[in-house]
């Protein structure tokens, strides 16, 4: 994992995997690194263990999106690990912890928009209120500023 910033991903007190992101862009090195590399993320919302006493969460695609949102003060933000990884199991986890309202803040690209619509439909099936937060082009939750976040999440 040399050359990577590594983040251990826990859920329910158990280490599920380690995710790394390259500190530099090298053509011979993948940008992201996950060990074990065959880990199934369909049942992981991170950091679910740390989101407590709230019925409202913000869903973002990646760990670095989540870290930025937490740094901005939004400690109810959960990472879903990509646009294709919001599953029925994750929906059940949100239901289990009592979530009744969700803001979906995915990247403003075709994949993010399509996934946000899918997540909204899944949440609707459980009567969980949701809204899609439309980010300006070129801005994802990983680089969002405090002022812009406050304006978008009103």
Q: Where are the language model's segments positioned?
A:
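Mg2+-dependent endonuclease catalytic cores in nucleic-acid-processing enzymes, primarily RNase H-like
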Residues: 92, 110-121
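A generic structural motif
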Residues: 130-138
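Acidic beta-strand-to-loop metal/phosphate-binding motif
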Residues: 59, 100-111, 133-134
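Phosphate-handling DNA/RNA-contact segment within nucleic-acid enzymes
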Residues: 1-98, 116
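Short, acidic/turn-prone active-site loops that include or flank metal/cofactor-
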Residues: 81-86, 107-109, 136
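Short acidic, glycine/proline-enriched helix-loop-strand junctions
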Residues: 123-130
């Amino acid at each position: 994992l040399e050359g990577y910033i590594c983040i251990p991903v826990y859920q329910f007190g158990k280490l599920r995997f380690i995710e790394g992101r390259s500190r530099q862009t090298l053509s011979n090195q993948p940008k992201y690194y996950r060990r074990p590399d065959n880990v199934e993320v369909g049942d992981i919302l991170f950091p679910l263990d740390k989101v407590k006493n709230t019925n409202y969460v913000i869903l973002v695609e990646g760990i670095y999106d989540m870290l930025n949102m937490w740094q901005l003060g939004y400690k109810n933000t959960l990472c879903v690990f990509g646009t294709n990884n919001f599953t029925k199991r994750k929906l059940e986890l949100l239901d289990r912890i009592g979530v009744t309202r969700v803001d979906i803040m995915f990247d403003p690209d075709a994949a993010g928009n399509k996934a946000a619509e899918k997540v909204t439909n899944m949440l609707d099936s459980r009567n969980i209120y949701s809204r899609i937060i439309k980010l300006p082009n070129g801005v994802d939750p990983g680089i969002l500023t405090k002022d812009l976040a406050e304006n978008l999440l009103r």
